[in-house]
Amino acid sequence: MNIAIVGTGYVGLVTGTCFAETGVDVTCVDVNADKIANLQQGIIPIYEPGLEDMVLRNVKAGRLHFTTSLESCLDNVDIVFSAVGTPPDEDGSADLRYVLEVAKTIGANMKKYTLVVTKSTVPVGTARKVKAAIREELEKRGESIDFDVASNPEFLKEGNAIDDFMSPDRVVVGVESERAKKLMTKLYKPFMLVNFRVIFMDIPSAEMTKYAANYMLATRISFMNDIANLCELVGADVNMVRDGIGSDSRIGRKFLYPGCGYGGSCFPKDVKALIKTAEQNGYSMQVLKAVEDVNENQKGILFEKLVKVFNGDLKGKTVALWGLAFKPGTDDMREAPALVLIEKLKQSGCNVRAYDPAAMDESRRRIGESVYYAHDMYDAALDADALILVTEWKEFRLPTWGVIKKAMKQPVVLDGRNIYDGDELQEMGFVYHCIGR
């Protein structure tokens, strides 16, 4: 089977590489010539555990190829996946220009039946627009070539994307013809053989499923942060509350961790897009709006705690940050809580010493040299008046606190992910604050 993946960002590159791993011949397409040249040389543009080795293995095996020309692929492929970006527009809606450009290119150049599958996260109704764009280009050519559209949303977690793709909880596929269903069944057969669920449905339902999943996950995060903030006010311990409610089989423990807010390429963007989709259809998503509001407030909570510790006087203070990426296992800083915190610290006259195991280069690209980039987590703590944990990387979980205390100017720790034993740190002489207790 031959397929093309348009877009070599996070979703496209992982998707193409994992399909190649199952024996499919995959061509990854991107208009960015520098990115394609780097990929052809084995230089991977994103940090994702296991991806580089898998790319190199499949390139060597002759199953994975890279090009800037979608037109050159269309004679040979059975399926084209569109995995291009859908950035938020000024009004919060998803910008579909790249998705529709791909559709137009396919319509202008296809010579045989092609199944066009949208992998990007897109609003309900996008498949209809893709179909119309392809049909319009075919009409311009005076051609009546058969084609199908489908929706196959991704459910990958950054930092665990390879395992998520190769061992999925489920695969959601929206189709509108038996021919398209047979092709997608054939493509996903290696996964079906080991009893993974492939759920076929209509296309609008598949498009909505992705948004609904992210809505639910974002809601659980904001719900727990809301509860955590109230716990602090009434003297309850959010960790105990989490254990109490998470033990209920109807609720479960996943995505019930309080912290300093969610970020990344999906939740913030998709929440805004779903709110906008509802507005365009005359409906107001009241719960989802609250989810967004809670999260925006939560990103500032560590700064508020720091202000209280120093009685409002932060000017000249040195603050160490552990973690810059929006979550462990990635270098992605899109909508990261650390960005909000750094901006507030700099505005208050603080000196910032930051360390992240993967996101240092990305941070330099985003905010330049406005902070000191430490060599390791201990260097970050040197002469610091306060240490703030923002991202719960594994290497931050068991630091040598005696060394940290000696390095710091003042032993103040703000735990933005509730991973430390506050009683232990307080016994050692630290001032310790966390979320929700």
What are these regions (language model features)?
Residues 1-437:
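Structural/interface elements that position substrates and couple domains in central-metabolism enzymes
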